[in-house]
């Protein structure tokens, strides 16, 4: 069965929700005025590859390693080219050249790219979830204003081991989370004395999106315990309920390790994590045990929290469940937590 380039209206809504969540993470970062990190940006633009054209978007966190170097994390979405709906995460090492009294910066970055792709199935189902590795190479020109804001123009090139390579041109708006003494990028981020996190318990509700041709959704929830195990490292144990609709009927337990940064006198924290997800119960359309029942899958997540006081916090989390049986999901949830 041919795999169409265009998606159903429901899948376009799901894609819009993912983009809105990316904007929400950017909003959390931009709210962090006297922060302890460096730059956060949201990009959007056009992409070509695989015999077609589409959109592309990304959000990017970058931290200085000195005047001429930086490290960055990006969540990169390659849109909907023919037979492929691909996105993923990349960690890049950047070289940068400040010009014109640091107001204009030219930089180039490269790093591993872990991608997740919904593709046409060779047999059976109309789709399959393909995962793989590649490289993300980027060239960027950035202009720094006098008020922490920066405008960026960036070209990306993906080279993957299986699937089409793509090229995108994107425009981005960024914000410096750690205010520099003069316009331009900071050389390094400020340090901290103690751990970002002590102990937290958070209950969340939200939406589960099955990564298929139609992207059906279901209401889900979770209960998370989070503990700081090092200055910038958290560990979580989570019961994850993905929903009860026929298309998405799965629940399980996840264990993850997170890299975490705190801003605005520790009121806001951003983190990225990865780990394992054990399916306790999965049912198919007829209510019988599903293919994933009792299996271990991967899970990768990003999360943002706002701490109201010493005890209470709000959290939003985007989980990507990565399976080996074509049941990948995006689980996007928000809720209230307690610190102790």
Regions found by a protein language model. Name each.
Residues 46, 78-81, 123-127, 157-159, ...:
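Extracellular loop and loop/strand-boundary signature of outer-membrane beta-barrel proteins
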Residues 65-122, 222-287:
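Gram-negative (and chloroplast) outer-membrane scaffold detector with strong preference
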Residues 3-22:
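Bacterial N-terminal signal peptides that target proteins for export
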Residues 63, 95-99, 143, 157, ...:
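Residue-level signature of outer-membrane beta-barrel architecture
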Residues 39-45, 72-76, 107-113, 152-156, ...:
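Transmembrane beta-strands of outer-membrane beta-barrel proteins
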Residues 53-57, 85-91, 131-137, 165-169, ...:
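Residues that define the transmembrane beta-barrel architecture of outer-membrane proteins
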Residues 39-40, 67-73, 101-106, 143-153, ...:
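Repeated loop/turn-to-beta-strand initiation elements of outer-membrane beta-barrel proteins
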Residues 35-81, 95, 103, 166-229, ...:
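Short glycine/proline- and aromatic-enriched beta-strand/turn motifs that initiate or cap beta-hairpins
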């Amino acid at each position: 069965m041919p795999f169409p380039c265009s998606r159903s209206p429901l899948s376009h809504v799901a894609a819009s929700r993912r983009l809105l969540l990316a904007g929400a993470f950017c909003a959390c970062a931009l709210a962090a005025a006297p922060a302890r990190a460096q730059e956060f940006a949201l990009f959007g633009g056009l992409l070509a590859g695989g015999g077609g054209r589409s959109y592309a978007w990304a959000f990017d966190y970058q931290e200085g390693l000195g005047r001429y170097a930086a490290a960055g994390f990006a969540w990169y979405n390659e849109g909907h080219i023919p037979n492929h709906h691909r996105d993923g995460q990349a960690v890049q090492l950047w070289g940068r050249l400040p010009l014109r009294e640091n107001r204009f910066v030219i930089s180039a970055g490269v790093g591993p790219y872990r991608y997740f792709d919904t593709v046409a199935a060779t047999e059976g189902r109309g789709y399959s979830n393909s995962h793989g590795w590649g490289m993300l190479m980027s060239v960027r020109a950035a202009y720094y204003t006098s008020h922490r804001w920066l405008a960026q123009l960036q070209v990306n090139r993906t080279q993957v081991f299986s699937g089409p390579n793509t090229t995108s041109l994107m425009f981005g708006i960024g914000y410096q989370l750690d205010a520099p003494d003069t316009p331009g990028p900071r050389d390094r981020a400020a340090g901290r004395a103690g751990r970002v996190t002590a102990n937290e318990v958070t209950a969340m509700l939200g939406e589960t999106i099955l990564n298929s041709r139609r992207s059906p959704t279901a209401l889900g929830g979770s209960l998370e315990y989070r503990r700081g195990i090092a200055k910038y490292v958290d560990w979580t144990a989570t019961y994850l309920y993905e929903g009860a609709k026929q298309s998405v009927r799965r629940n399980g337990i996840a264990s993850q390790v997170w890299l975490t940064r705190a801003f605005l006198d520790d009121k806001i924290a951003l983190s990225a994590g990865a780990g394992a997800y054990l399916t306790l119960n999965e049912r198919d359309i007829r209510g019988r045990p599903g293919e994933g029942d009792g299996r271990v899958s991967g899970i990768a997540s990003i999360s943002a929290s706002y701490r109201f006081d010493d005890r209470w916090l709000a959290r939003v989390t985007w989980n990507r469940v990565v399976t080996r049986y074509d049941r990948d999901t995006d689980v996007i949830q928000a809720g209230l937590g307690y610190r102790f």
